[in-house]
Amino acid sequence: MQNSKKIIPVLILIGLICLPIVQFFGNYNYVIHMVLFCFLYITMSSSWNIIGGYGGFISIGHNVFFGIGAYFSGFIYARYGISPFYTAVFAGLIATVFGFGVGLITLRVKGPSFIISSIALLMIFRTLFDRWELVGGAHGITLPHNNLSVEWSKIPHYYALLVLMVLSIFLSWYVRHSKFGLALRSISHDEIKSEVTGINIKIIKVTAYAISAYMIGAAGAIWGDYLTYVRPNIFFIILIAANMVLMCILGGK
């Protein structure tokens, strides 16, 4: 039984790696698109689960980092021609740094107050990027198409998001089984008792918030390139964060 639990994920991963082979037998772009879409949300929900599931802080504005990653890589690509496949790592880092700063401010409150503050953050960024002419304002940034044929144009993004999905699942698993994750879950149950035991609750919460932002930012970079445009009304909408929350609620922590 234990061996089967280890083998099944490996078999699924092998199947996902081999899936694009179907393109040799016809145009299965829609299938590839839907699987790729699943990769995106698994990546983001696994990352959100670190702060929302383990930490107990329900962030309804977490796709701010999705937009930051998309805009960072999109701007670099449009201005300097450096592909988001190279800058996604740095997009994640930018999102992490920003997440740390935001966490220092918003994580001072909890419960409904934190939820409201996360929604307010999303609204602020939607308004900011709607009016920021440097990045195209409400029209956003249009990115170049790749030179691959229609049948194969999605495949680079497919594998990029597959890698991010695997890494985000592993990161979530690793956090859960680490001392850091134990402290984080302790805080979610009772902050006062956790602090009494010597846990630095401020650092733990802010670090968890920043870690959860990384993969979401990197995913935003790849998704922006996949769409070939980055706009506020696509990346800074509450529906994206709501989907992350629902996936974690329905799928479990």
What label would you give each PLM region?
Residues F37, Y41, A70-Y71, G92-T96, ...:
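Residue-level recognition of pore/gate-forming positions within transmembrane alpha-helices
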